[in-house]
């Protein structure tokens, strides 16, 4: 069994990398991937604490987060495709208004 501290360290490392990507990058696609890293780090911590406390609720929360993330990605990619068709850019700074 993996010690809890290793799982927490992995979750924190992924969270820091994801937060850095969201805050520092200007490409919308990279920002979306960084958000996925943030959510996956939370999933790792949910599962690690669930295993540590011998409770299955951490896994259930992780499954809910994965389902919500899948819906979020579907909507975000739809908006991204519409944005590329209208503006021909993926930079966050170039997109200031969402009206067509």
From Swiss-Prot:
Gene3D superfamilies: 1.10.287.3510. GO terms for cellular component: NADH dehydrogenase complex; plasma membrane. The keyword Hydrolase does not apply. Keywords: Cell inner membrane, Cell membrane, Membrane, NAD, Plasmid, Quinone, Translocase, Transmembrane, Transmembrane helix, Transport, Ubiquinone. Its main location: membrane. It catalyses: a quinone + NADH + 5 H(+)(in) = a quinol + NAD(+) + 4 H(+)(out). NDH-1 shuttles electrons from NADH, via FMN and iron-sulfur (Fe-S) centers, to quinones in the respiratory chain. The immediate electron acceptor for the enzyme in this species is believed to be ubiquinone. Couples the redox reaction to proton translocation (for every two electrons transferred, four hydrogen ions are translocated across the cytoplasmic membrane), and thus conserves the redox energy in a proton gradient. NDH-1 is composed of 14 different subunits. Subunits NuoA, H, J, K, L, M, N constitute the membrane sector of the complex. This is NADH-quinone oxidoreductase subunit K 2. It comes from Sinorhizobium medicae (strain WSM419). The gene is nuoK2.
């Amino acid at each position: 069994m993996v010690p809890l501290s290793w799982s927490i360290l992995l979750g924190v490392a992924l969270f820091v990398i994801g937060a850095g990507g969201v805050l520092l990058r200007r490409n919308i696609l990279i920002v979306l991937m960084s958000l996925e890293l943030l959510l996956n780090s939370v999933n790792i911590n949910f599962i690690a604490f669930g295993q540590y406390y011998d409770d299955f609720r951490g896994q259930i929360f992780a499954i809910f987060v994965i389902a919500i993330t899948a819906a979020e990605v579907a909507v975000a990619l739809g908006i991204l495709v519409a944005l590329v068709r209208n503006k021909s850019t993926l930079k966050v700074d170039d997109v200031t208004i969402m009206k067509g």
